[in-house]
Amino acid sequence: MHNGSGRVRLLILIFLQGLLVVRSSSSVVIAADIASSSPPTGRDPVASLQRRLDQREVQLEYATPWGYLLSVLKQLQVPLSSQTLVFSRTSFQQFLISPATPRALYFNDTVYVGWVPGGDVLEISAVDPERGAMFYFLNQKKAATPQFIQREECLQCHESPRTLGIPGHLVRSVFPDSDGLPQLQAGSYQTDHTSPLKERWGGWYVTGTHGSQRHMGNVWVIDKDKPDQLNTEAGANVISLQSYFQVSTYPRPDSDLVALMVLEHQTRLHNLLAKAGIESRVAQEQQTAVKRALGEPVAQWSESTRRRIHGQDD
């Protein structure tokens, strides 16, 4: 009997390990599955603000030409000084975006807010402590009780290998034409804190001085037969954007390079933290399944689970 039970135990273990190997063959698929199937925690800042609106604890004020933008920023404690401006058509309301009408993006530690002049909606993403990024729209039509609506279509771009396979954030640098359309045949860059300056800010406005280094911002492709050639000298060390578009349309007249660099660092960090949290939960769920099947104490971690969560050196 002892040998028989041992063989059964071994077969169960082999079977379960096989399932885990199959499931672990793509960490992107696992993380995306866990993140997408988990219910919202309701603990992200936008969900919290919606509860306060529903309970009449706060109100959103509407102001032309920005709609609810300024009030949303105030309630979510997002500073206007975080404003960055992107004129490439690489977001949801792309047909309204151009070098003459860039999209404004504002952020703090846990929220990103996008506004386009004349846009139907505010585009908002917030950091959920378990699921990663949560995406919302807020209709810009004046309403008695504005509603933040969760939108899954944002995941078409915001859940991919570029975001580590989870709902996340990304900053892109492209070769835009004079209408803001990315010339994708020239390629593009995903920007984070490790990116060299020369590959940053294609399709973005950039204000501030940066010495002799050059970047891709403030300019667009002139010759579509040579889409990877930008006059980076013309876009360097720009102090004012008044010659590019009507800056009075926006709450601020700038798109500060320091704000851009913080944004690029933060989006990558948010994705890494979310990925680590999701994969830790995956490891614990798989550990629980194996332990229960073998009749062992669930609370006792195996060495392999400990290494997956804490790393090889722990």
What are these regions (language model features)?
Residues 30-119:
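N-terminal alpha-helical interaction blocks
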Residues 5, 24-27:
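Serine residues within intrinsically disordered or low-complexity segments
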Residues 11-25:
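Bacterial N-terminal signal peptides
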Residues 1-8:
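N-terminal secretory signal peptides that target proteins for export/translocation
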Residues 114-314:
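Sequence context surrounding c-type heme c attachment/ligation sites in exported
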